[in-house]
Design a protein with these regions (language model features):
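Extracytoplasmic beta-strand/coil segments of soluble accessory domains associated
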Residues: 90, 122, 126-162, 166, ...
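Outer-membrane beta-barrel signature, preferentially recognizing the C-terminal barrel domain
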Residues: 229-231, 332-354, 387-389, 471, ...
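Periplasmic-side early beta-strands and strand-to-turn transitions of outer-membrane beta-barrels
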Residues: 194-195, 215-225, 241, 252-341
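Gram-negative outer-membrane beta-barrel transporters
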Residues: 452-458, 548-550, 571-653, 688, ...
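Short, acidic, small-residue-rich periplasmic hinge/interaction motif at the N-terminus
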Residues: 59-114, 122, 152, 353
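Face-selective signature of the C-terminal outer-membrane beta-barrel domain
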Residues: 299-321, 340-475, 479, 483-485, ...
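C-terminal beta-signal and adjacent terminal beta-strands/loops
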Residues: 550-552, 644-651, 669-715
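Short acidic/polar hinge/loop motifs at secondary-structure boundaries
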Residues: 163-192
Length: 715
């Protein structure tokens, strides 16, 4: 099975991939061998200018791995280095080599991120054809992200594999503490992912990977470099950019490696602000934004030279704080809303290998604060809403190899707590703003087995879930994936998976401001089947798939449009069925890359015509994306992104009229002058100045111009 190295490929759909390690020299350290476990090892350096095709194969029935790249045809083309295999992703509990696993994973690499015309992590996901990104404000002020026709509550957001979902509301899920420059890659797993990422991954999961690079070149998993990292070098990265609507963003990143202990530390900080692109009826700013982030991460090997146990530990801690004009986010009748959030993230992750047995324990704690003002700065007229959430979790994933394949098992405990002015049950001892609250715990067990043959892989398992809030017994959600490799270019895959999601605290208790919640909502459940085919050679990659989702008890906010005094109510939809098709094509020709993708969805639900949906039934019927990346000359590169979206559903205007969502197209472009130590760029978003909405009554900005520069200093 050949694996093709795709340079600057925006949102490559990939199957689980095994990290290829490249050794420039041997360190004779025990943890260097540990880094090789489950990965392909290559020795030496291969230049793109001389490498046409290379392949590495095993002599047993476990894996066949290779690589192909296009040679540089021009003398002035940048001289780049390529390894045989660039990305390791996880679509199963047990790590599997590329070409073995059946789950489809979409990967956005470091190079793709640098080429994108975006100001936030949220904007990066718009290019993934199966992902729906609905914005209520610019530069990541508030963004709802979902997959394959779901809602923002139905996906799991992970930071380095740690679940950071907010049990209060999915609206705050993307308050990430890391800057774009911290990211190594973004992984998108489409479809139910319960047995891989646990509960809340009803329609999929998104994993933001910021793991620090090992500048010594000895750590395999961390061998992928973030933007400022240079192998063997401590360094500092600076970024400064500005643009339309008073936009300004500054960031810095420091990477340090302590040679005696191999302790790696990365710390980053960023600040972003904007005046916004419109004003309220009273002439006040109502789409302004300001926010800052601080993020620290580190790792260190713990094994000694003589130890037979190989281990390492990594950790991260981060802070995200932002305030933004909420425009007409939650009510068209009030156009001076405001919201401020603060998020704290901490996690410690371990990895231990004892012979064939591997352990990956994790412990994490996240805290969030949220203050919402219906009338900005006027608490006397309408009291502010205050919320504080705490999430504590313990997770253990283990696996071992034996004659029948690879088996994974483990467990997770997650406790979710909220203190609020209006969410939850009355507290016995109120304090500060908080008079209401709720606490619930989720316990899950998982088991998975993988049968690995030369051309066939079968992965089957289940997750068993029990939540203290709900009266349902311990419930099992199974899944099975299969893939068949036909020759060196074709792959067939099929899967059946199931998952569930507990209601958020907002869905259970938010009964203010024209909303009425139901605290007796049932958990959502989904079962899905999927099948597809993938073809790839040195120039072309094609992938086509079809999927069917059968959902029970989907949660939504609905309103009876016949009643002028009606309020939004949280309800369970009995059944919702979704049929979808996806197609991806990528072409590489010398200095150019062209990527086209299309997704079509159709949902069937016996719903009364007078009921208006706020989330579940407002899905993208059609989404088309196109990316063109061209190396113009010398160090100058051009990236052009196009997106067409056609959304189902309706919304009620401030005048009481019911309107359907209209399809729209957006065109973005970026020119980048890239040298070894610096880059200068200019980009334009919404070049045609098109007026559109992702949510009713919340207009999005028109043409937005941004220019910036980055500079990397080796210490």
């Amino acid at each position: 099975m050949h694996v093709f190295l795709l340079k600057n490929n925006m949102y490559k759909p990939l199957f689980n991939q095994c990290k290829a390690l490249r050794f420039r020299h041997f360190s004779r350290k025990r943890y260097a061998l540990f880094a090789c476990v489950g990965r392909v090892v290559t020795i030496g350096v291969l230049s793109v200018a001389t490498l046409k095709s290379a392949a590495a194969t095993t002599t047993d029935d476990i894996s066949v791995v290779g690589a192909t790249t296009s040679a540089a045809s021009d003398d002035d083309a940048p001289d780049k280095e390529a390894t045989l295999d660039e990305v390791e992703v996880t679509g199963s509990r047990a790590p599997l080599a590329l070409g073995q696993a059946a789950r489809m994973v979409t990967v956005l690499s470091r190079e793709d991120i640098q080429a994108a015309s975006v100001q936030s992590i949220n904007d990066l996901l718009k290019i993934a054809v199966g992902v729906d990104v609905r914005q209520r404000g610019p530069i990541g002020a508030q963004t709802d992200v979902t997959i394959r026709g779901g809602t923002q509550e139905q996906i799991t957001i992970l930071l380095n594999g740690i679940n950071i979902c907010d049990p209060q509301t999915g609206h705050n899920a993307f308050d990430l503490p890391c800057d774009v420059s911290d990211i190594v890659r973004i992984e998108v797993l489409e479809g139910p992912a319960g047995r891989v990422y646990g509960t809340s991954s009803l329609v999929g999961a998104i994993n933001i990977v910021t793991s620090p690079s090992d500048l010594s070149g000895k750590n395999g998993r961390e061998g992928e470099k973030a933007e400022s990292d240079e192998e063997g070098q401590n360094n500092v990265l600076f970024r400064l950019e500005g643009g339309s609507f008073g936009y300004l963003s500054a960031a810095g990143r420091l990477s340090l490696l302590s040679r005696p202990s191999s302790l790696l530390s990365n710390i980053s900080a960023s600040y972003t602000r904007s005046d916004g692109y419109q004003r309220s009826k009273n002439g006040h700013l109502n789409s302004d934004y300001s926010g800052g982030k601080v993020f620290y991460q580190g790792s260190i090997p713990l094994s000694s030279e003589q130890s037979s146990v190989v281990s390492k530990i990594s950790w991260h801690a981060g802070l995200s704080i932002k305030g933004f004009g909420s425009n007409t986010f939650y009510s068209a009748k009030f156009d001076e809303q405001y919201e401020k959030t603060l998020k704290l993230y901490t996690a410690v992750q371990g990895e231990v290998a004892v012979g064939r047995l591997h352990f990956r324990p994790n412990v994490y704690w996240n805290r969030g604060y949220d203050r919402f003002e219906l009338i900005r700065g006027s608490e006397e007229r309408v009291p502010f809403n205050h919320h504080r959430t705490d999430v504590f979790g313990l997770n253990l994933n283990s696996w071992f190899d034996w004659v029948a394949g690879r088996t994974a098992f483990g467990a997770e405990f997650r406790n979710e707590d909220i203190r609020s002015t209006n969410l939850g049950e009355p507290l016995s001892e109120p304090f500060s703003y908080y008079k209401m609250g709720l606490n619930r715990s989720n316990i899950s067990l998982h088991l998975e087995h993988n049968i690995l043959l030369k051309r066939f892989t079968l992965s089957a398992g289940f997750i068993a879930v029990k939540n203290t809030w709900n009266e349902m017994p311990l419930t099992v959600y199974p899944g099975i994936d299969a893939s068949l490799r036909l020759g060196s270019h074709w792959k067939l895959y099929a899967s059946y998976n199931s998952s569930l999601r507990m209601p958020s605290f907002t869905e259970l208790y938010y009964s203010v401001g024209g909303h009425k919640a139901d605290k007796h909502l049932k958990p959502e459940e989904l079962r899905a089947v999927e099948g597809g085919v993938k073809y790839s050679n040195s120039l072309l990659t094609l992938q086509a798939g079809i999927f069917y989702h059968h959902s029970r008890n989907l949660i939504d906010w609905v309103m009876d449009t016949r009643d002028s005094e009606a309020v939004w109510q949280s309800v369970n939809h009995t059944k919702v069925n979704t049929l979808g098709q996806e197609f991806n094509a990528t072409l590489h020709v010398k200095r150019m890359m062209l990527h086209l993708a299309y997704c079509h969805l159709h949902q069937s639900k016996d719903e009364a015509s007078y009921l208006q949906s706020q989330y579940s039934l407002e899905y993208l019927r059609h989404k088309l994306t196109a990316q063109l990346q061209v190396h113009l000359f010398s160090a100058l590169n051009l990236s052009v992104n196009y997106r067409f979206q056609d959304r189902m559903g309706t919304y009620t205007t401030i005048d009481g009229d019911i309107r359907s969502y209209h399809p729209y197209s957006l065109l973005d472009a970026r020119l980048n002058w890239q040298k070894d130590s610096y880059s200068i760029y200019i980009q334009g978003n919404n070049l045609t100045n098109h007026r559109y909405v992702d949510y009713g009554n919340v207009p999005q900005p028109g043409f937005w111009l941004v220019a910036g520069a980055k500079y990397n200093i080796k210490l």
